[in-house]
Structures are given as structure tokens and as C-alpha cells.
Amino acid sequence: LKDTLALRHTITGFYDKDNYIHDVLTQSLLLQAEAAFFQYQNQFGANALMMLSLAENESALGRSYLAYTRNNLFGHAAYDSSRYASTSGSVYSHALHYLSNAYMNPSQFQFHGGFFGNKAGGMNVSYASDPYWGEKAAQYFYEMDHAMGDRDHNRYALGIVKNTGVSIYKNADKKSDA
């Protein structure tokens, strides 16, 4: 999947952006998972900043009840008996099972685009009932990338086409070359 999406990430560490993330994380369980975000980005092709943004959204910046009592940063399978051994385990499960094998895998029914999205496209079609879930997660992503100098913002144009009869254009313009 990593090669399929041709992901190349320019953000390589949490301290790329002054102390913003450090200030947020020192009071949350997200700090314990720092290395896991990058390890599983490289292992499974799931963007670390995207996973962190989603974890911030789903776990109240790593301070939610599920984060503290279950090491669960994403709210997945949050049953009384279900607990991750560590926050890294939560990131592993999210990167492998939810992103790489489902929501970011074009051959799976959950795939509607490799972005947070809304109810028309992206992960939010199947992931969350809140129609604004994608906007909330994307806001965390945008704020962190902006604080790091907008190194990922508008850097890539990715597309996955399963039908060979679809025209692909260089720009979002009627006059663009195919």
C-alpha cells in the first residue's frame, strides 16, 4: 500500500515545529506514542501526521477517558475488557487494521479516498457518523503542518483510479491537458 500511494513524507519528527506539539503532548498520552507514529508510518504507509491528527481528534488531545484507562487513542473497539497494552499498540492497530488494511486500501469497501473527507468522499464516508469529523481531524493536521512551515500542505496531488476509462487531468480545469 505504501508504494501504491507513493507516499513521501517531509515531516520526520515532532520537534520539527518549535514547541507546539511538545506543549500539547506533555499533558497527554500521545507523547508516549511518538516513535510509534513514525515507525508505523514507515512500516504500513500511514501518514504519521494524519494518524496523530486523528488521535488528537478522537482522544481529546490524548487526554480522554479511553486514552487514560485503555491506552486507546482512537476509540476503536472500546469495550470494558478491551485494553491496549500501550499507546504504541493503539497506534499499531490503527495504522495496520484501520488505515493500511481498510480505509486507505483501494480494494476494500471502506476506501472512499485517502483523506479525512466528509460524507461524500474520504475516510468519513464509512469511518464516523459525525459529518464534520473529517474537518475536525483535518484542522489538527493543518495546524501542525502550518506550524512546521506548511511542508505537506498542497505538496502532493495523489489519485487512485480503478477504472481505465477515467480521464486524468493535470489540473482541475476544463482546458487542462489529460
Role assignments for model-derived ranges:
Residues 1-50, 61-178:
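Catalytic cores of secreted/periplasmic lytic hydrolases that degrade extracellular macromolecules
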Residues 53:
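C-type cytochrome heme c attachment motif
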Residues 58:
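Pyridoxal 5′-phosphate
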